[in-house]
UniProtKB/Swiss-Prot annotation:
InterPro entries: Creatin/AminoP/Spt16_N (IPR029149), Creatinase/aminopeptidase-like (IPR036005), Creatinase_N (IPR000587), Pept_M24 (IPR000994), Pept_M24B (IPR033740), Peptidase_M24_C (IPR032416), Peptidase_M24B_aminopep-P_CS (IPR001131), X-Pro_aminopeptidase_P (IPR050422)
Residue sites binding Mn(2+) 2 per the record: D449, D460, E572
Sequence positions that bind Mn(2+) 1: D460, E558, E572
Protein name: Probable Xaa-Pro aminopeptidase P
UniProtKB keywords: Aminopeptidase, Hydrolase, Manganese, Metal-binding, Metalloprotease, Protease
Molecular function as annotated in GO: metal ion binding; metalloaminopeptidase activity
Names of required cofactors: Mn(2+)
GO cellular component: cytoplasm
PROSITE patterns registered for this protein in UniProt: PROLINE_PEPTIDASE
GO terms (BP aspect): proteolysis
Family as reported in the entry's similarity comment: Belongs to the peptidase M24B family.
Keyword Protease part of the UniProt annotation: yes
Protein function: Catalyzes the removal of a penultimate prolyl residue from the N-termini of peptides.
Length: 654
């Protein structure tokens, strides 16, 4: 699943060597469904909502109001009750910032969502395309609106401390100011229609899957805190808390996390969570090692803890560690910048390097997940081509989920399945909805990006198929993307190399044709946790220069190509970084490479063998042989699927 953006313009497929696209035959039923495509991206009339928000802004004496996407834990994916930016703007993508002045409103988002946002925003909104030349950032737009000593407001729980400071400094130079408003104004506009916060029970994640007890993890964390000479660590990121305590929850769809905070000091471990989420099993699991406290007492406790520390040690008091993703509100509760050390979380670094138990779980769950995908694609082709069944995108996605549920340790999906036919595949984060989605056309490209949660790991895989006869242009585009995937998969590089440095390997073949894609090449993947996991990744984000790829990292490898209004192509495998043996060891340092764990055939009729080198063709055939070896036993009593798999994994020749 696509996690991160790349600020580069989309190019046209005509650059592949033709000035026009060959016509794609579509039955009338498909054409009708595509005509309804815009309905899937319905706009919401935000006039009344904006009017009410502006009334509240006047009452609070602010001129500009910022509405981030994130919740108070800076989560990428959020619970329905935290969908404030979507409520006020109508834009449902996972990333973006809304800004409202007394006369204007703007929505900033990245390249994954340009198409979607342009369809969902009504006439009240201006779309700020992030990374596009001559388009202001949301910070620049805000500063422009706040000229002349105006006041900008934001909920301090929804913006990072560093983000607030940066904006505050910019506004000061403009004679303006930033204020935190603890009562969220969008919540007041939303009123009684706002969904209730989730109240699901928390579950213990057994050590046989985590590979390490929570006591061992806390001990390791305390060693890191001792090295940094800090008074303690206040933790706000939900996946970090779930990982640290070997607990899982259901508060955010598809992400097995729960709303909580934690404070770890040299002598205490405190978990801040609503009491009604705690079961006797969790109490027994945590035992005497962890004190459970009310969720809403975190800010008061953090303030008291910091003040007590300063009173005891005076000016020499050591600072509290806080993630650089933590909220402005949490930083202020600890006394602000001078009493806090903001840094990349040591838990994020530790979590990103999977232990041997987690790596084994990743391998195992991807084989089971691959079997589900094989059964699904065999079924889908048979329904569309042989039975002539009319299926829409949601019908297909539901069938895939149904198949996955049959496999051991299945615990749900890891994100909304992107089941997309024809032009819908060009919408990078397309979300089909029953009643407005398209009928799947067997004579068009079908892109399916999906993933699942298993107790032993998390999967994320994209496959692009054509169940008819693809055009030469479609085959060429697909093969260029495949070459990029292979380049990352087979890369060998010295320890200390970042994902930023590797990114060009995936893009090089598209670049040679003057083409590109508007998203990152890879993101970290959690172990029965969030499908998007930092701090590592492969892409052009500056953050990726700061964290080198390390053995044990689990990352997606997912180059793509998108022709707006026509089709999308993406191929995605999950890969694991590991040390590799090389003939030489320049610099006397370890050399790294990748091991792929995704096991599903790559659409063979979209591959143009003449565009592959001999080594690339060998990689494809070796990969398909591995898929066959590891999955065919699932279909001993299913001759149809077994035959389909055998056909799709047979050697390809030039």
């Amino acid at each position: 699943m696509l996690g991160f953006r790349s600020p580069i313009r989309l190019c046209k497929l005509s650059a592949l060597g033709s000035t026009r696209l060959l016509p794609i035959s579509r039955p009338k039923l498909f054409s009708t469904a595509v005509a309804r495509y815009a309905a899937d991206m319905e706009t919401v009339n935000t006039t009344k909502r904006l009017a009410r928000l502006r009334q509240l802004m006047q009452e609070h004496k602010i001129d500009v109001y910022i509405v981030p996407s994130e919740d108070s834990h800076q989560s990428e994916y959020i619970a329905p009750c935290d969908g404030r930016r979507e409520f006020i703007s109508g834009f449902s993508g996972s990333a973006g910032t809304a800004i409202v002045s007394m006369t204007k409103a703007a929505l900033s988002t990245d390249g994954r969502y340009f198409n979607q946002a342009s369809k969902q925003l009504d006439s009240n909104w201006e779309l700020l395309k992030r990374g596009v030349e001559n388009v202001p950032t949301w910070q620049e737009w805000t500063t422009e609106q706040a000229q002349g000593g105006k006041v900008v407001g934001v909920d301090p729980a929804l913006i990072t401390a560093s983000g607030a400071r940066s904006l505050e400094e910019t506004l000061k130079r403009n004679g303006s100011s930033l204020v935190g408003i603890s009562q969220n104004l969008v919540d007041l506009v939303w009123g009684k229609d706002r969904p209730a916060p989730p109240r699901e029970k928390v579950r213990v994640h057994p050590d046989k899957f985590s590979g390490k007890t929570f006591q061992e993890k806390i001990a390791d964390l305390r060693k890191e805190l001792e090295k940094k000479k800090t008074a303690g660590f206040v933790i706000s990121m939900l996946d970090e808390i779930a990982w640290l305590f070997n607990l899982r929850g259901s508060d955010i769809p598809y992400n097995p996390v729960f709303f909580a905070y934690a404070i770890i000091t040299p002598t205490k471990a405190e978990l801040y969570i609503d009491d009604d989420k705690i079961t006797p099993e969790v109490v027994a699991h945590l035992g005497q090692d962890v004190v459970i406290k009310p969720y809403n007492s975190i800010f008061a406790d953090a303030k008291a803890l910091s003040e007590a520390r300063r009173k005891e040690a005076g000016e020499t008091a050591s600072k509290f560690l806080l993630s650089n993703k933590a909220s402005w509100a949490l930083s202020l509760s600890l006394g602000g910048e001078e009493h806090v050390e903001e840094t990349r979380s040591p838990i994020a670094d530790a979590k990103a390097i999977k232990n041997e138990v987690e790596l084994a779980g990743m391998r195992a769950c991807h084989i089971r997940d691959g079997a589900a995908l094989i059964e699904y694609f065999a079924w889908l082709e048979n329904e569309l081509v042989n039975k002539k069944t009319v299926l829409d995108e949601v019908d297909a996605a539901d069938k895939l989920e149904q198949i996955r549920t049959k496999h051991d340790l299945f615990a749900g999906l890891s994100f909304d399945t992107i089941s997309s036919t024809g032009p819908n595949g060009a919408v990078i984060h397309y979300k089909p909805e029953k009643g407005t989605c398209s009928i799947i056309d067997p004579d068009a490209i079908y892109l399916c990006d999906s993933g699942a949660q298993y107790l032993d790991g998390t999967t994320d895989v994209t496959r692009t198929f054509h169940f008819g006869k693809p055009t030469e242009l479609e085959k060429k585009a697909f093969t260029l993307v495949l070459k990029g995937l292979i380049a990352i998969d087979t890369a060998v590089f010295p320890k200390g190399t970042s994902g930023f440095a590797l990114d060009a390997l995936a893009r090089q073949y598209l670049w040679k044709e003057g083409l590109d894609y508007l998203h990152g090449t890879g993101h970290g993947v959690g172990s029965y946790l969030n499908v998007h996991e930092g701090p590592i990744g492969i892409g052009t984000r500056v953050q990726y220069t700061e964290v080198p790829i390390a053995p044990g990292n689990v990352i997606s490898d997912e180059p793509g190509f998108y022709e707006d209004g026509k089709f999308g192509i993406r191929i995605e495998n999950v890969i694991m970084a590991r040390e590799v043996q090389t003939t030489h060891k320049f610099g006397d340092k370890p050399w790294l490479g990748f091991e792929h764990v995704t096991m599903a055939p790559i659409g063979r009729n979209l591959i143009e063998p003449s565009l592959l080198s001999d080594l690339e063709l060998k990689w494809v055939n070796d990969y398909h042989a591995e898929v066959w070896d590891k999955t065919h036993h699932f279909f001993e009593n299913d001759e149809f699927t077994r035959s389909w798999l055998q056909r799709e994994t047979a050697p390809i020749t030039k």
